[in-house]
Amino acid sequence: MDVLPTGGGRPGLRTELEFRGGGGEARLESQEEETIPAAPPAPRLRGAAERPRRSRDTWDGDEDTEPGEACGGRTSRTASLVSGLLNELYSCTEEEEAAGGGRGAEGRRRRRDSLDSSTEASGSDVVLGGRSGAGDSRVLQELQERPSQRHQMLYLRQKDANELKTILRELKYRIGIQSAKLLRHLKQKDRLLHKVQRNCDIVTACLQAVSQKRRVDTKLKFTLEPSLGQNGFQQWYDALKAVARLSTGIPKEWRRKVWLTLADHYLHSIAIDWDKTMRFTFNERSNPDDDSMGIQIVKDLHRTGCSSYCGQEAEQDRVVLKRVLLAYARWNKTVGYCQGFNILAALILEVMEGNEGDALKIMIYLIDKVLPESYFVNNLRALSVDMAVFRDLLRMKLPELSQHLDTLQRTANKESGGGYEPPLTNVFTMQWFLTLFATCLPNQTVLKIWDSVFFEGSEIILRVSLAIWAKLGEQIECCETADEFYSTMGRLTQEMLENDLLQSHELMQTVYSMAPFPFPQLAELREKYTYNITPFPATVKPTSVSGRHSKARDSDEENDPDDEDAVVNAVGCLGPFSGFLAPELQKYQKQIKEPNEEQSLRSNNIAELSPGAINSCRSEYHAAFNSMMMERMTTDINALKRQYSRIKKKQQQQVHQVYIRADKGPVTSILPSQVNSSPVINHLLLGKKMKMTNRAAKNAVIHIPGHTGGKISPVPYEDLKTKLNSPWRTHIRVHKKNMPRTKSHPGCGDTVGLIDEQNEASKTNGLGAAEAFPSGCTATAGREGSSPEGSTRRTIEGQSPEPVFGDADVDVSAVQAKLGALELNQRDAAAETELRVHPPCQRHCPEPPSAPEENKATSKAPQGSNSKTPIFSPFPSVKPLRKSATARNLGLYGPTERTPTVHFPQMSRSFSKPGGGNSGTKKR
């Protein structure tokens, strides 16, 4: 068919459409030729008579019934292209008749332009002309060069009416041509959508045919994109989940669009402004955290394992990979960068065809949404949980293999002597979980697994691991030692990666058929190990150097590179991910080589990590105890004892009693082991119950006058002037001067009010009895003042901070000599001696709760002292308080007939702490 343009004196295009034979090959040629002065007859399609005309809808429907379709995919595709081309040609003929219905030269010209315009690649040049007169085309071109409306109006005002009518007629004609083309494309779109919908219905019928015929399966409706509406996405999600379960899985042509649809829906659900996120994550400015992460990312790029990211020619691809990893580290600063991300990002970039933004979307959806929380955080807590859960699932599904591996582990522990062999599956499952099997299985199999992970969740990871161990179980059961097991697994790992040891369709069939979804008891196991597990040390993550052990880890890795290389070679079956366990295994070797450093490495010892890192694998105790209890049972008891001894020693060193000289002399520190623990005496609260007086006296700074450091015997008799300047008299004088301030303190008003009444009587007491106080009761107060809170020093309420004594040379070295001779294990003997030598002191000094009967008798003694002659005593007598019946029944006043005696030897000094001396001081 030859179509020749008309119109005198202007160039045209010659279009030749030639159909050769019945094969249906078409050739379109366009070339410039000289103008033809005469108009040829109307164009005629050669071969149109042999093929009857059909409607446009019937051509699309007859594509599937072409005779050549049975000859193969290529013949079917050629027939489809030919049918589409013929459909376009017949459509052009109909539009030609509709657009150029007139007769004569004008009608032929319009029909010619309509046909020629359909063969153009783009309609943008239609406005420029070439089909109408040269003058009209020049005018339209000049109009297009003036974009503003003002300039166009000025240009058109210069034209006469005939020229304007010609321009208007030409514009209307070309608008009609473009409208016809648009209508034709819309009709073609409708036909294609109808065909797609018909194919989707076929897929829906197939899915329902292979389903379990449940009620929810009847609602399956397959679509390529989520439809609008409330349940549109969920319907699409369920259908694609069913497609992923088929043996063929999701086609690779759909994978990119399917993954992006899932990621976009997640980002929309959390209300993320993606444009703003892209500007933040991919900006060229360097953040403070970028340097450390960038260094680690560059170190791991050569270990990616993908061929497209290795070699000198892949430099640009590595730059893109680094940008994606750095962008995710900026997005999720909690996770940052973890070793193994480079493998995940490389595979995602391959699916996303190198698009950085799309790859970042998939990483966010995979790590933040699909995988468990804290799967890649600093301590890999969720990873350790899944490793412990996997061992339990292995015992449930493959009991023989699990028992065989436990036997190999116990044998290795016995033969190694002081070493420790972790569970044999840990070395491999850690690598599988962190890289999602990208380093141990072929690429196509990994992508199918990832499709299932995106739709089914992280449960697929455990299922695939069980399926792999089940496949390799026959060869593993032949191993007799742990070394043979590692050698066999290294060989099998290479075969799985290179020789397709596992068929993808068989593997996925095993994954979906081993148990119903969700996996029974999986949620309970994860919850149990989540709250009963110690995660990996924080130093496992290379880029986050935090904590006090990180520096030691870094120094070990820097100082001992040979040891690290040896460990990496020992676990060479890990491939590009073999360096991940090197730091931990290196520490175990150091622990064996240097037993003297056991205490310093105890915090990083893998033997003390709970089920997430290691497990004793004692199957005989599994029925009675869970894994957490087994870990605690295997803990070294001697180590716990040594640790307890160190803690106790530190506490004893922190507890000390400080004796300060009253005249600003040197400070003498006495440890609690040098004094006897007896009740402290608060001189301002004499006569009160011990429960009410212990708080104010604890950790008190006791002032001892005249400490010269010499050792002399105590003087039995002193003159009256020296006795009046004793510490007790000084306390009385100070409180008489500060009476208003002292009475304002709770718990002290009653006692201070009685000091005046007995001050004169106390001055006339004998000298020998007056000497008994500093040697007996003062020492007792000093012994009681120590407590675990000894680092805090408090002054007794109402006491002057710097009391001034009349005689500053009073020597109390005898008190120190006696304190040094006392022992903690002679508490009772010392108490009895003091009772015999100093009866007045016993009368007024309360005893610890360990002697309730004596305390009860002592509390009753002051009641009878009012009617009898006052017994010689340096202490003022205090009127006892009326006791409350309710408090007595509750045991607040000590043991009675209704409240039995309870001894707390270690809590005797803190027994009365809640009372604090503030309650029970008001007279009733």
Swiss-Prot record:
Keyword RNA-binding included in the entry's annotation: no
Sorted alphabetically, the Gene Ontology BP terms of this entry are: negative regulation of cilium assembly; positive regulation of GTPase activity
**Compartments (UniProt record):** Cell membrane
Molecular function via GO: GTPase activator activity; small GTPase binding
- Which SMART domains does the record match to this protein? TBC
Q: Where does this protein have compositionally biased stretches of type Basic and acidic residues? A: 47-59
Disordered: where is this region? Answer: 1-76, 94-134, 541-564, 776-806, 838-924
- What are the Phosphoserine sites (modified residues) in this protein? S800
Q: Which UniProt keywords apply?
A: Cell membrane, Membrane, Phosphoprotein
Superkingdom of the organism of origin? Eukaryota
Has keyword Ion transport?
A: no
User: Its membrane topology, per UniProt?
Assistant: Peripheral membrane protein
Q: Name one Pfam family in it.
A: RabGAP-TBC
Residue ranges annotated for the Rab-GAP TBC domain, each copy included: 249-457
Q: Which PANTHER family match?
A: TBC1 DOMAIN FAMILY MEMBER 30, TRANSLOCON-ASSOCIATED PROTEIN TRAP , GAMMA SUBUNIT
User: What is the designated name of this protein?
Assistant: TBC1 domain family member 30
Q: Name the species this protein comes from.
A: Homo sapiens (Human)
Its taxonomic path starts at: Eukaryota, Metazoa, Chordata, Craniata, Vertebrata
